[in-house]
Amino acid sequence: MTTFIEHLNGVDFENRENVKIRDRYNASVPTVVGPVSRPNSVFVEDAKLLRQQTEQPIKWALPGPMTMVDTLYDNHYKSREKLAREFAKILNQEAKELEAVGIDIIQFDEPAFNVFFDEVNEWGIDCLEEAINGLKCETAVHICYGYGIKENTDWKNTLGSEWRQYEEVFPKLQQSNIDFISLECHNSRVPIELLELVRGKKVMVGAIDVASNIIETPEEVANTLRKALEYIDADKLYPCTNCGMAPLSREVARGKLFALSAGSEIVRKELSARAIA
C-alpha cells in the first residue's frame, strides 16, 4: 500500500495525521495535500524483471481505491468518493502498463470492503470497475479480515460466532466485471455457504491461515477446498492463502505454501478419480 502511494504526487508523508483505519484502530497516516497523480510507473520495471524469470502466469497485487482512501488523511478533495475515483484512474494507468509487460492477473486488495458496506455498494465497486476498465488480462479483488497483526486479531475476536461481512458485498461483486474474488476461509468464521453468492466467478479460496505460525497439514487444506467445492465449480476454484504472509517467518511461510500445494494435489487427484469413474 505505502509502497505504491509514496510514488504519487499530492501525498505528503511528512505531514501526518491520526485517523481511524478500517473503522477500528488509529494510525498515523500521510496527508493528501493536492491533486493526486502518478508521475511515473511504479512497479513496471519490477514486473519486467519477474517476467524474465518465469514462463508461469504472474499475478500482481495493487491496492484498491477504497482501501487507499482509508489509509490516508484527505485535506484536499474532502470526499472519500472523489479521492477514490482519482486513485482508480491512477491504478488503471499502472495496471495497463503491467499488462503490457506480461502480467497475467492484476489483483486489487480491498480489505476495506469488509467494513464500509454502504460505500462499497454505492461507489466502491464502481471505482474498482474504473480501475480495471480496458484491461484484457484477468482481474481479481482480494477481500480478507487482515493478516496477523494485533489490531486485526483483536477485531476478529469481536465479530461473533459467524462472520457474514461478505454477504453485504458479494451480490454486487457477482455482477461486476472482476474475474476473480479472493477470500479468507480457513480458520475463519465465514459461513462457507456464502460462496454460493458468487457462483460463476473464479474464486481464490483461502485455505491457509496467515494469522498463525502453525503450519497446516495437507489434509486440512484439502478439507477447506472440499467444503468450498460444494458451492464453487471445480474449474473455478483456485487454492490460495487467506492474505499476505509478510508477518510470518520465511520458514513458516514456506511450510504453509508446501501444505497448500500438497493439499491442492490431494483434491485434484480426487476430482480426477471421480471423472474417470
Give the ranges of each region predicted by the language model:
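Domain-level signal for soluble alpha/beta catalytic cores
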Residues: 1-277
